[in-house]
């Protein structure tokens, strides 16, 4: 390993695969707060963060678990949940007076229609000003869950496959075909906060 002066050990967070310091420096030099969006398999987290010498400060945050408390019955890891999380974060940020930000996607690859960009679209719809390209954001029918509705309708013929695929939706009392209306209701509730 490190036997001579030519070998340089990377920073710990770089070794752990958590931080791209070159990208982080570019974002910090902008002087704007960062919209940090992270997705796991079952949840989406969004935070508005600003730099401080002692460590980053979270100005506002939103999580899909907050959506569940507001009455969301769908899966918390899908695109509609990511969009609603971004909308909730944007609404909170505008109330706090932070209307401008820059997207921090972390180590996620920039893929068209990804959940991180659904969070971005939600924050934009809440009134935030974030530089972006329109081609990277998913279509409106994916953000409101129409693709889930279409898939559920195509699977309806095979009752066993339908019940297996959408068991959690049915358990929570939400018919998957009603997801777009459910998302629209929750969107209205968030916008009226």
From Swiss-Prot:
The keyword Hydrolase does not apply. The keyword RNA-binding applies. It comes from the Archaea. CDD domains: Ribosomal_L18_L5e (cd00432). GO terms for cellular component: cytosolic large ribosomal subunit. Transmembrane segments: none annotated. This is one of the proteins that bind and probably mediate the attachment of the 5S RNA into the large ribosomal subunit, where it forms part of the central protuberance. Part of the 50S ribosomal subunit. Contacts the 5S and 23S rRNAs. This is Large ribosomal subunit protein uL18. It comes from Methanococcus maripaludis (strain C5 / ATCC BAA-1333). The gene is rpl18.
């Amino acid at each position: 390993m490190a036997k001579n002066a030519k070998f340089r050990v990377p920073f710990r967070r770089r070794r752990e695969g958590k931080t791209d310091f070159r990208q982080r420096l570019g974002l910090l030099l902008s002087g704007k707060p960062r919209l940090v969006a992270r997705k796991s398999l079952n949840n989406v987290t969004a935070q508005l963060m600003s730099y401080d010498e002692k460590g980053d400060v979270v100005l506002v945050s939103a999580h899909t678990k907050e959506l569940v408390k507001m009455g969301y019955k769908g899966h918390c890891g899908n695109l509609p949940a990511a969009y609603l999380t971004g909308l909730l974060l944007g609404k909170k940020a505008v109330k706090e007076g932070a209307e401008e930000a820059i997207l921090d996607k972390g180590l996620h690859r920039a893929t068209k229609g990804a959940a991180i960009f659904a969070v971005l679209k939600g924050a934009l719809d809440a009134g935030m000003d974030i530089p972006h390209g329109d081609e990277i954001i998913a279509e409106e029918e994916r953000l409101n869950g129409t693709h889930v509705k279409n898939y559920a309708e195509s699977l309806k013929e095979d009752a066993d496959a339908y019940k297996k695929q959408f068991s959690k939706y049915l358990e929570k009392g939400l018919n998957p075909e009603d997801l777009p209306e459910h998302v629209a209701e929750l969107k209205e509730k968030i916008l009226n906060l």
